[in-house]
């Protein structure tokens, strides 16, 4: 009896293990974004199976001619985040890999909405800081020098324009780090003062 229970337990553990992703942490957003095909800011329009349709609100790097792209997420043992993390209408900055070829077993006709993904679509890795949460013009997440595997580290929101400048090589990592550690009240005062003196429209602090 005990031997039978032990065998069942071992089989269950093996089954779970086969469905788990195994990968090393590849780095925060500032470290991993350069190795991806496309970096953009977008809004989730719909979710279907293990994919989301994302509106292309702003391209930070790369080329994409469609207004809406499909991003494939967790299924089987693929090292990707769970679709439930990205509800409809939520806003994100994502560093994405283009799916360039089919993989064996990547498509099951019995579950067409759950698959590896289609050639020409994109996938989002969970092995680093490949996505940042966006609220208006401000982003948070594993952006720069954040603890491994922590998706919502304690930080000051960083303006999207600065992240865009970093992705395009106009500022260095130090600028991101400084912005993520600024005192929010002091920064808001500086923004208000700058807007008053120059008459420019500055993004409202979150």
Task: Place the predicted regions along the sequence by residue.
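OB-fold (S1/OB) nucleic-acid-binding surfaces
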Residues: 50-73
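Structural detector for short beta-strands of small beta-barrel domains
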Residues: 35-57
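Short boundary/loop segments of OB/S1/cold-shock single-stranded nucleic-acid-binding domains
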Residues: 20-36
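Extracellular secreted precursors and ectodomains with disulfide-bonded cysteine-rich loops/domains
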Residues: 19-21, 77, 125
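N-terminal signal peptide c-region/cleavage motif recognized by signal peptidases
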Residues: 14-16
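Intrinsic-disorder/low-complexity, polar/charged segments enriched in Ser/Thr/Lys/Arg/Asp/Glu/Gln
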Residues: 37-39, 68, 91
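Bacterial N-terminal signal peptides that target proteins for export
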Residues: 1-6
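Netrin-like (NTR/C345C) domain of secreted extracellular proteins
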Residues: 79-206
